[in-house]
Structures are given as C-alpha cells and as structure tokens.
Regions:
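Residues that recognize and position ribonucleotide moieties
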Residues: 127-128, 153
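Periodic small-residue-enriched repeat registers in elongated scaffold domains
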Residues: 1-75
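Stable alpha-helical elements in mature extracytoplasmic
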Residues: 91, 103-106, 130, 156
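Active-site-adjacent substrate-recognition loops and nearby beta-strands
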Residues: 43-49, 87-97, 113-125
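Glycine-rich, low-complexity segments
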Residues: 56, 60-104, 169, 183-186, ...
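C-terminal intramolecular chaperone/auto-processing assembly modules
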Residues: 94, 140-197
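Glycine-rich, acidic and aromatic/proline-enriched surface loops and short helix-turn segments
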Residues: 109, 131-140
Length: 197
C-alpha cells in the first residue's frame, strides 16, 4: 500500500496506490483515490476504474442476502449481467391472486415521464413512474420513495395478462361479428337473386 492512508488487507500481488484505497484478494489494483477493490482467485489483474468506486471481481457470481438465515436476497450468477431476485414459492406467504384487468386500468392511469436524477447529469435520462404514484396505485413495496424491480415486473406482467384477456374477448367478438356479417351477406345475395334467404 503506497497511497496515503491506503490498505492492502491480504491476499497476494495486490496494490493500493490510490489515497484512502483498499485492495484484497489476488492481483487487486486499487489505483484510484478512495477506491475499494476485491479480486477473486482469477490469475489476472483487476483494477479500479475511477475515484471513489467499489470494484469487485467474483467470477463465480455474487450473492447478497438480506436476512440472518440467508434465505432472502439477490444473486448475480457467474457470467450474467442481471440480478436474480428471490421468488421461490416456498419463501412466500399471504399469496393472493390479482385482477389483471384492474391492474391494466391502473397502469393506464399511472403517470409516466422521463427525468434525470438530481445526482446525475441532466443528459442521463430515465423513464418511469414516480414511486409515490406507483405506491398509491398498487400498494406494493416497503415505502413510497422506491420501486422494487420485483413489483414493477409483477405489475407489468399482470397488465400484459389484462391485455391478453381483452385481446381474447375482442377476438371472440370479432369472430361473432364476422359470422353475423357472413349470414347477412348470404341473405342479401339471396334477396338479390330473387329467392328467399
């Protein structure tokens, strides 16, 4: 550790050159100020990318648990770019079916907008609802300032089911109307021929 107030916590071939940086594991390179770098046993350098960043290489995947038993949390499988949230039936209780058409109507009324976070540059745009509106519409999650991806995904899937139900109803109505039209066309053709329908 050559950076001011930097630490190499253990492992081998690690460096902490950035001031207030931390390196541990195998070939972890904390080269930026305030950077934290932990590298697994992979035999190649793993370096910080900017000042004040948290950098972890875990080529076997990541697991973050949010309870003492380790039965709740998220995983980032090896080689993946997306977090997997716990959704096991065995981990759930008070399961209640949803009314997909009701959810669809609420999604239709949900204000959506584009925006940027105050902490980010104004050119970095995002799209979606405000957490307060989402909580008021669906009553999901722990508070009205955040939206869980599990809840947003569930609402989207329920709304898609509602659209599917509407589509099926419309398809049935169209089929019935096509039959009525075909019957009327036969009657008109018969009348034009001067015979009884």
């Amino acid at each position: 550790a050559s950076g001011a107030a930097a630490t190499v916590a253990g492992g081998i071939n690690n460096t902490a050159n950035g001031s207030y940086s931390f390196a541990a594991g195998n070939r972890a390179k904390a080269i930026h100020m305030g950077s934290f770098v932990w590298a697994d046993a992979t035999n190649s350098d793993f370096s910080s990318v900017a000042n004040n960043t948290f950098n972890v290489r875990a080529s076997g995947g990541y697991t973050l648990t949010s309870n003492a038993a380790g039965t709740s949390g998220v995983r980032l499988p090896a080689g993946s770019g997306t977090w997997n949230s716990l959704s096991d039936r065995a981990a759930k209780e008070n399961v209640v079916p949803v009314d997909s058409l009701d959810i669809l109507a609420k999604v239709g009324a949900l204000p959506l907008s584009t925006w940027n976070y105050i902490s980010q540059d104004a050119s970095i745009r995002h799209m979606g609802p405000m957490a307060q509106d989402f909580a008021a519409a669906f009553g999901l999650g722990e508070n009205d300032t955040t939206i869980s991806t599990i809840d947003a995904d569930g609402v989207a899937l329920a709304a898609i089911q509602g659209l599917y139900q509407q589509n099926q109803q419309q398809a049935q109505l169209i089929a019935q109307q096509q039959q009525v039209i075909a019957d009327l066309e036969r009657r008109v053709a018969a009348l034009e021929r001067g015979s009884k329908p």
